[in-house]
Amino acid sequence: MKVYVINSSVDKDRAKFSTCLANRLKEKGKTLLISTKRSESNIEDFYGKDGMITYDLADYFTDLASFDDVCVKEDDKLNFIIAPIISNKHDITKENIEKLTKEGDYKYVVFDKLDLDLIQDKKSVFIVEENKIPASIKEDDFFLNGVGADFDVRLHKEKIESIGKNFLGEVKLGDGFDKIIDNLLNDNYVVVPNLSFFEKLKMKFSKWQTLYL
């Protein structure tokens, strides 16, 4: 079994990417998608089942419902478990996650948000907003999401490389996650190119024009 953990400062981006990743992984083997935190966009929304599911993840952890009860079958290759409907209903423990990942016969498990300390063997991804590149992250990999059409990743080369983690690329507004998922699954990491001398000179000249003309 291979486990993926997807984290982000923006809930809707995380849920959408987690769903897209699970949909891709199911082509290679049976996949379980698990959400641990409820937000304005949830995994069940992407499958058209909002308000149609009785049990959630906390019900399983508190023994209110069995694994089969909380597990929603999307198709023969993909099942999912929704986040607790009531926030702070249950504090997730390492023992909870260990028990959960032993359930069923899954080749892949995708967590839509999870504390990385709760599971040992995993591949983790952090989704970064265009103008909010952090100084550091705990996750293995990261990518920039929702960048504008005029975004030039080369201008952010120093910040990206200073994070010291694997960079999967950037996603422009309105584009899908196919390229990022390809890079993630194939361990293809993006090396941000340098600006050429003439490009730097041109940018300085443009800045000078803006200031003095």
Where are these regions (language model features)?
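Residues at the starts of beta-strands that form the adenosine-phosphate
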Residues: 29-30, 77, 123, 141
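Conserved catalytic-core segment of NTP-binding enzymes
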Residues: 99-176
